Structures are given as structure tokens and as C-alpha cells.
């Protein structure tokens, strides 16, 4: 491969999953040198790869599952030594709540940091999270200044936190002025019962789905003439109508959409439910089976489309102080286990 033109070599490397790429860099000095010396290789590589799927019980659990993109086998699982909640994901960072400890971690760079939340009203005890309190906690990386990105535990869209109300209107709370305003907008006329409100590339997105079609809406003109604009229609042709028990749209990141289907399986002695994950690749315009959810998993699950990122973030990669620990530090085995699950080579 050393004799290939650089642009062809890059195209080959861009098609390799991140674990294999890490192994290549460990075993081939020439390729390691090429990757490290090529400007913007990392940013281009991670912009192309598909997100993997990370999920955990909604009310917290020591067991976490991870589906690697392009791998339809059973998910990788890990059992942490303490009860774990995943409160959010953004730009390759995970916001974790481990045994009353708030932690931000980057599995790719193997950096993490425990945060002091003693003054926060959101985390006085583990019980508050089980009560659904995590639903009002957002997590974002503020990249206004590209040279000094930093993470914040809020969900930011143009400097505000957004809530979608039952009537379709949106409440925006400005973090700087500490004032709220109501955005008078209504749901699209075609809105269905299966919906998902999310953010893609810092833009608000609404998913509305039927058993036949999935509609993707983008929020336009937030300050002047707010409205939902239909940007994509996806044919929903993956459901097993004869055995269908339930289904939900679980995640969307602009590159792929994840649908969870529960089917009723019968054998000679009894009946049982099987949960299957389907993924729609927007670039290839096709459905594929991501895999199945283990039978021991609860029905209430939180899903995160995880894409690793090598970017540095203020507060996480700062080497001053003892809050930043190496990945192999034995004092925090639960964080290590989660990072090995996502990025470990096995």
C-alpha cells in the first residue's frame, strides 16, 4: 500500500472501521506516519463513518449494550460495577451518572473527568434520575470558537434550551439573558403518533412515522417565520406485519435512522417477544438489520447514535490537576469498562 497515491490510500483507510484503523497504526509505522502527517485526516475520517448504537435501560442499569456499525452480530455488552445512567451524548463525548458521580468521557482519546455537581439541584440523589429527571438534562459541545471548544451540560440551539410542548409550540430559554420565549409553531398536518424530536448538526429535527412512510422535518426560520419543512420521506418497509407487536423510531442523526421493532414469536409451548433493530442509511437509501436486542433487556431503553471524535475539549483534555485520569486508572473501573466496550480492541 506504500506505493499507492495518497488520495487512493486515504479512500481505502476511510472505509476501515475505527478499531481496525487503530490496530493498523499499531502494526504499520508507514501508515501511522501517513495518518498523523496528513492534514485533516482525522476530521475527514470521522465525518464519513456511520454512527454505532449505544443503549441502556432508561432508569439506569449496570449493563450497557453496544452495536458496532456494519456488524449485525449480537451486541457487545459490559457490566459496570455500579449503577449507570447515560444522560447524553455529543461530539464523541458521553455524559455519565455513576453511583451519584457525574462524569464526561471520550472513549476514543481515553480521557474522562468527574464533575463537581454539589450545587446542582438536578443530582441530589440517584432517586431523582429514576423519576424521569434526566429528561430535562441536555448535553452539548459549544463550538462557537473552533479553537477552544468546551462542553456544557445543556442542550444548546442558538444560545437557548428548547422544549417541545404538547400543542407543537416550542419554549426557548436563553442561557445568557435567562429569559424564555414562546415560538408559536404547530405540528405538521401529517403528524403521526410515532414521533421523535431531536437535533441534527445543531438544527432542530422532527421525525413523524407511520407503518408505511417516515417523514423527516427540519425547523426553519426560527427567529422570523418559524415552520417545519419536510426534507425527506423514507419508505417504512421493514415491519413484519403478521407478527408485529409494537415499533418505535428510536434515533436519528442525519446519516442514519434507527427503528426498533418488537415481534411476537410463537413456538409449540409458549409465546415470547423479540426486539429487532433496523437501520436506514440515508446515503445509500436502504434499510438493513442492525441486530437484535438481548431478551433480558427491559422494554424501556435509551438509544444513542455514537460517533467517536478525536477533537480536544476544554475541561476534558486539560492536563492540569488530578481530575483527569489515565484510562487504565484502577480507581474508576466502571468508566474504564464503558470506554473499552466502545473502543476496546478484542
Curated annotation (Swiss-Prot):
It comes from the Eukaryota. Residues 1-49 form the F-box domain. This is Putative F-box protein At1g57580. It comes from Arabidopsis thaliana.
